[in-house]
């Protein structure tokens, strides 16, 4: 579950979303710099940085539909493999973004866990990080098997 898979450095798009209902204006610039330095500490190639302003996050994708269209065109023009968003996404938001953009999307929590995983040196440290990653992943598995919910049943089946 690492950002770098198969020793291939991925082309990354950073999406920094300023949500008015969640943010304090004085912290935003520091948050942007912190987010960029977090991503630069991973083995990725940052090809694009997108800064968005939004009043209220969308419950379906966290990003409004019009801005998603713009992001999709930027991604297709720049050969992007990975999208990193500076907010914590719900499992359904993450899944909806990945389905819409056809790219891997990770949030800030997954990014931080991946950084810890790449830098853990002791056996116990590696196990603790892996446990944290699996706990985070377990919340993402909900509704992943909805295609099996309506199975046929009856006598002889």
Feature-to-residue mapping (PLM):
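Extended, highly charged alpha-helical segments
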Residues: 111-157
């Amino acid at each position: 579950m690492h950002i770098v898979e198969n020793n291939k450095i991925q082309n990354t798009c950073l999406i920094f979303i300023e949500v008015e209902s969640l943010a304090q204006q004085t912290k935003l610039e520091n948050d942007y710099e912190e987010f960029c330095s977090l991503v630069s500490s991973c083995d990725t190639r940052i090809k694009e940085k997108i800064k968005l302003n939004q009043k209220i996050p969308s419950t379906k994708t966290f990003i409004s539909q019009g801005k998603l269209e713009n992001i999709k065109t930027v991604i297709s023009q720049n050969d992007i493999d990975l999208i990193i968003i500076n907010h914590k996404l719900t499992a359904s938001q993450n899944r909806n973004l990945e389905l819409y953009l056809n790219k891997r999307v990770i949030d800030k929590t997954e990014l931080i866990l991946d950084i810890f995983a790449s830098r853990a040196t002791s056996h116990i440290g590696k196990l603790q990080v892996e446990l944290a990653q699996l706990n985070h992943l377990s919340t993402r598995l909900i509704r992943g098997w909805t295609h099996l919910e309506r199975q046929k049943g009856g006598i002889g089946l």
